[in-house]
Amino acid sequence: MLTIDGTFACASTGLEIHMIGTASHAAYPEAGKNPGPALARLLLEIEKLTEEYNRSRGFVRMTLIGMDIGSANYGVAASEGTLRMTVRAEREKVFAGYVDEIKQIAQNTADDGGFTLDIQEIERFPATENHAVNVDKLRKCAADQN
């Protein structure tokens, strides 16, 4: 029997953050809205948020999975982009707040740039947290059986 105090498995979810701007000819990028710079700033803001959470609220992690901006069409400035990441946290309450703050930062970034925003959560899993009292009861029962 395996027992562990505290968290056995972190809460986690994939996040797909998609921003849509306005296309323009590559010769006139100022006529469109390219989400590339906004997504880059968003990634940096999420990294700062992650550091702050780790300092003050407990273990969280953001793993960048990928970022796609535009397409291989050299005559058109990018008008869409997607940031993909996996986020996790040791405690469920911390995780919920962390994910909510990421979504709020994404919304603020999209609003500031005039982008349409779509956020998808992919395969959200709750934390598996073992409460000390219950772990102690389990250990006592196991010891009584030996």
Put a short name on every predicted segment.
Residues 1-44:
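Fold-level recognition of mixed alpha/beta catalytic cores in primary-metabolism enzymes, strongest
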